[in-house]
C-alpha cells in the first residue's frame, strides 16, 4: 500500500551545471535508473528538468509506466502535451510571472486544470515583484494570480484547484 510520502524524487536532469558529455551521460544513466526504480515500485516521480528538455522527455518516454509531476516546468507547449497525454502533471513556480516567461502563458492557457500544480521552489524563483529575493510560501499567491488572469478565473479558484491537485498527487485528499 502506497503511503502519501512514497515517491521517487526529486530526480531528473540539470544541464545548466553539467557541461561535459561525460557528465551529462552519467546524469542520464542515473535518471534512467531512478525512473526504473519508480516503475518497479509503482511510485510517482518528481522530475527536475533544467536545460535538458529533449533528453529528459526521451528518458521519460522510455518508462511509460511512470507518472508524476514535472516541477518548475519550463519546457515547450508541444512537450507539455506529450507529458499530459502520458498522465503527467506540470507544476509552475514564480518564474511564470517574469517578463521573459514566453512559453508559460500558452501552456497555462492550454493545460487542463486537473494537471496543474503550483509551487514556490523556495528559496528560489520568487515571483515578480519579489524577483531576486528569497522565495517563501506566502508568495505563491502571485503565481496563482498570473494563472487566474490567463485562464479567466479568480485567484481563489486557481488556489482551490491546485490545492486539490496537490492533495491528490501526494495521496492526502
Predicted regions and their residues:
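Short, small-residue-biased leader/transition segments that mark boundaries at the very start
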Residues: 1-4
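Catalytic metal-binding/acid-base residues of hydrolase active sites
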Residues: 12-14, 89, 97, 123, ...
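Mid-to-C-terminal alpha-helical segments outside catalytic/metal-binding sites
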Residues: 37, 139-173
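Short acidic/histidine-rich active-site segments
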Residues: 114-136
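Catalytic pocket-lining loop regions of alpha/beta-barrel enzymes
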Residues: 24-117
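A short acidic, helix-capping loop that chelates divalent metal ions and anchors anionic groups
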Residues: 14-21, 125-130
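Non-membrane alpha-helical structural segments and their capping/turn regions in soluble enzymes
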Residues: 21-32, 50, 134-141, 156, ...
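Divalent metal-coordination and catalytic microenvironments
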Residues: 10, 38, 71, 83, ...
